[in-house]
Regions:
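Active-site loop/lid in soluble adenylation, ligation, and acyl-transfer enzymes
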Residues: 2-81, 85-89, 94-95, 113, ...
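Structured beta-strand/loop patches that form or line metal/cofactor-binding pockets in enzymes
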Residues: 165-185, 189-193
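A structural signal for short, well-ordered beta-strand segments
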Residues: 106-108, 183, 214-216
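N-terminal catalytic or cofactor-binding beta/alpha core of small enzyme domains
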Residues: 44-47, 90, 121-127, 131
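Long, positively charged amphipathic alpha-helical accessory segments at protein N-termini or as interdomain linkers
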Residues: 119, 134-170, 197-268
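Residues forming anionic-ligand binding surfaces in small-molecule and nucleic-acid pockets
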Residues: 90-123
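Short acidic-glycine loop/turn motifs at beta-strand connectors
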Residues: 60, 186-188, 200
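Ordered, amphipathic secondary-structure segments that act as subunit-interaction surfaces
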Residues: 115-116, 126-137
Length: 268
């Protein structure tokens, strides 16, 4: 599959206080996953120094993204969702159902060493790093949501909560049917689900990079979804993120733009 240069071009890339932000888009499920995979696998080609890439997006079609190790899908689920696109993520975890214009997805790609113990300003021990990444971004996203939406005064009777057709059939299949200790809920419904992959740098086996994909079920909080709410959540996230994780980057933005266009072919 080719990654069209018009999907990620110079106009869609913005450097905000040392973090590369790719403009919010609404694309099909296969293309959304291809872009995330491309950025992660080509991270070393896109920048010569530590950097962080942040991308918020929505899905233009009904899509089920499958965890990397989810290989066997129950035929009954396939039949009930036969009009949905099923596409693999590069990250692990369980399946996520993406509804057009209803939920919001975040992808973050960066070096593992940005995740630090902020009380000690030290790197997190390797055995705790995955849990720490999950917890860090769940907290950042939740703080961004609650800063945007007054959840204390929400009338839950007006909310059309995210539900699936197969109910208990999806308990072992659906990410949002399973809540981890670090994940956030509202009125008994999971709001944020995160999945992670960590790999060695191709040019430095002693250091590692990570990709985090987080899905936010805003429809489990808001009776009314609109672009201003989504944009405010995104801006709050970027503000929180920059205050906590200030990455030292020199003038790499032009290099990044040129390299992203130059290497815009999957599988290189």
């Amino acid at each position: 599959m080719k990654l069209s240069s018009h999907c990620i071009d110079e106009k869609s890339i913005k450097l905000i206080n040392k973090v590369f932000v790719i403009a919010q888009t609404s694309l099909g499920g296969f293309l959304n996953m291809a872009i995330d995979k491309f950025i992660f696998e080509n991270f070393e080609k896109l920048t010569e120094e530590n950097a962080i890439f942040v991308r918020f997006y929505t899905f233009a079609n009904h899509t089920v993204t499958l965890g990397y190790f989810q290989n066997n899908i129950d035929q009954e689920i396939k039949n009930m969702y036969k009009k949905w696109a099923f596409v693999k993520r590069i990250t692990g975890g369980k399946a996520v159902f993406h509804y057009p214009k209803k939920d919001l997805t975040l992808c973050v790609v960066g070096p593992v060493n940005i995740i630090k113990d902020n009380t000690k300003h030290e790197n997190i021990p390797s055995q705790n790093i995955i849990k720490s990444i999950h917890k860090t971004f769940n907290e950042l996203l939740w703080n961004s949501i609650t800063q945007t939406i007054d959840i204390e005064n929400i009338n839950i009777e007006n909310i059309n909560f995210y539900e699936d057709k197969t109910q208990n059939k999806l308990t072992k299949f659906d990410c949002f049917k399973n809540v981890q200790a670090f994940e956030k809920e509202f009125n008994g419904k999971k709001v944020i689900g995160t999945a992670i992959k960590i790999s060695q740098f191709s040019n430095d086996p002693y250091n590692h990079k990570f990709i985090l994909q987080a899905n936010i079920k805003l429809q489990n909080i808001c009776a009314e979804l609109n672009l201003p709410i989504k944009n405010k959540i995104i801006q709050n996230f970027l503000d929180h993120f920059d205050k906590i994780y200030h990455i030292e980057i020199k003038d790499l933005v032009n290099q990044f733009k040129k390299r992203l266009l130059l290497h815009a072919t999957l599988g290189r």
